[in-house]
Design a protein with these regions (language model features):
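Alpha/propeptide regions of enzymes that mature by internal proteolysis
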Residues: 2-4, 10-13, 17, 28-300
Length: 300
């Protein structure tokens, strides 16, 4: 049995968000008309954990009568601006060439419009850039150099996104001289083997950690961040932030932004900038986003 994105969101919404959104229930996926959804009694914002500190900014937009997508942007640009959040925006972990490349997408429920960018360098707020693609072009997605040029033309400043902390973490990864990279078969391949440095290979773990601790000290990684940096080398993170909003009118919007999989090959795009993979909003049903291994999510 195959499910459409609408069916998937409808089933998920009914199963896990009925209380928050005051849904009039359907226990099965829609087979024709969209399920009936009442507007919530109060506006609702959902976000990945790294957006929690910025929820008040989103609610401030909604309480002032602002648009749901503007509220989403207020939440997710917070982590993009934070140099200590290495999953998105400024300070995001770089690719294998030590270059930060960012992806984002957004969807506006009331107008059913969408915008997306992928592989963007030197522009911090790619969530806003995706929104600008939606509002000022006849396209849905721009990528790489074209997306960057469009951003500069539209007034986005050119910024160095690589912080010293992220650069040193990359250096720690590079200097381990290991096979912990993204060449070769992926997770879904029967030929895939976990690298020798994976956490579940205990016979190598303690010795490897000690060597990496010494190397981290030599590189200049702060002692309090040392183990976090080592963990990022051994288990490259795929951090993302998604945010979805619904107001009292039942209007919805959603967006996802990320610096992608750490140490990825240059030019790699995961699920985050892909409409229907990293984020999807259906005004008649609901809004959802994803985080984790983008390659696997795209195939679902």
């Amino acid at each position: 049995m195959r499910f459409s994105r609408r069916d998937f969101i409808a089933t998920t919404a009914i199963g896990s968000a009925s209380l928050a959104l005051d849904l009039q229930g359907q226990s099965k996926p829609a087979t024709g008309a969209a399920p009936s959804v009442n507007p919530p009694k109060k506006a609702v914002i959902i976000s990945a954990a790294n957006g929690y500190n910025y929820l008040d900014r989103g609610y401030a937009v909604l309480s002032g009568g602002g648009d749901t997508l503007d509220a989403v942007m207020q939440v997710i640009t917070g982590p993009e601006d934070d140099p200590n959040d290495d999953s998105v925006g400024l300070g995001g972990l770089p690719n294998e060439d030590c270059v930060v490349e960012l992806d984002a997408c957004c969807m506006h429920g009331p107008t059913r419009m969408a915008g997306s960018v992928a592989g963007v360098r030197d522009i911090k707020n790619v969530s806003l850039l995706a929104k600008t693609v939606m509002e000022h072009t006849g396209h849905v997605m721009l990528v790489g150099e074209g997306a960057q040029k469009f951003g500069f033309v539209m007034g986005f400043p050119k910024e160095n996104l690589l912080t010293e902390r992220s650069r040193k973490t990359w250096q720690l990864w590079r200097e381990t001289m290991s096979n912990d990279d993204w060449w070769g078969p992926g997770l879904a391949s029967p030929k895939f083997k976990f690298p020798d440095t994976a956490f579940n290979v205990s016979e190598y773990y303690d010795e490897r950690i000690k060597r990496m601790e010494k190397l981290a000290e030599t590189i200049g990684i702060e002692p309090e961040f040392c183990m976090a940096a080592i963990e990022r080398v051994l288990n490259p993170p795929s951090g993302t932030i998604h945010c979805s909003v619904v107001n009292e009118k039942g209007e919805m919007s959603g967006a996802t932004t990320t610096s992608g999989l750490a140490w990825k090959l240059a030019g790699r795009a995961g699920d985050s900038p892909i409409i229907g993979a990293g984020s999807y909003t259906d005004q008649d049903v609901g809004s959802a986003g994803a985080t984790g291994n983008g390659e696997e999510n795209i195939k679902v």
